[in-house]
Curated annotation (Swiss-Prot):
CDP binds at G102, L103, G104, E105, G106, R107, V201, G202, L203, R204. Binds 1 Mg(2+) ion per subunit. Belongs to the archaeal riboflavin kinase family. One of its GO terms (molecular function) is riboflavin kinase activity. This is Riboflavin kinase. It comes from Methanoregula boonei (strain DSM 21154 / JCM 14090 / 6A8). The gene is ribK. Residues 1-92 are annotated as: H-T-H motif-like. Its EC number is 2.7.1.161.
Amino acid sequence: MVLAEDLECLKALALMGGMREPVFISSQTLGEVLETSPQTASRRLKALEGQRLISRTLNPDGQHITVTKEGEDGLRREYAEYCRLFAHEGGHYTLPGIVISGLGEGRYYMSLEPYKKQFLRHLGFEPYPGTLNLRLSGSDIPTRKKIDSLTWIPIHGFSAEGRTFGEVRCMPCRINDIPCGIVVPGRSHYPEDIVEVIAPVGLRDALGVKENDRVNVEVAYD
């Protein structure tokens, strides 16, 4: 886990352009940016480097620093958490569903690297290989349609292994404070009473649910 003060330092380096290219900075200057001593700034850099969140090349009068992919992913997770936090100011829809078995295809699709990278970038987590499948009652279809009218995140398709994998839509959501995402294949005629949910953990185990148990999915809106 990244400490708050180290995350502050990482954010400052990213704002200087460290995610695009190496930035040259001394511990003295970084300390001034962070309103702390050069020694403390140096310790934070060592901590970030130790966690592989930055890479750096030392020079006599400073250092070239680059925010690594791991560092960028850490910032994206932080951003996603703030988005979920403040999105609740608008309100939320609650979508109750009954746990059902799927076809097992979710495990395969969630293991594909191009999908995993996009979910990490947009949702702030790498999905557990598999989906939680829920069936809605007829009375909850209107709520599902309201959620469908919100702005969804497109997950782009790609070609691999001699196959073409289509676009997927996803919607950030939560189940019992676990960050999740509703996923809908791009193909038309997807059943409106079925909801597939991804998460960073296996939801059946994390929630302690089994077939025919009831689960509430919460979707925030502005």
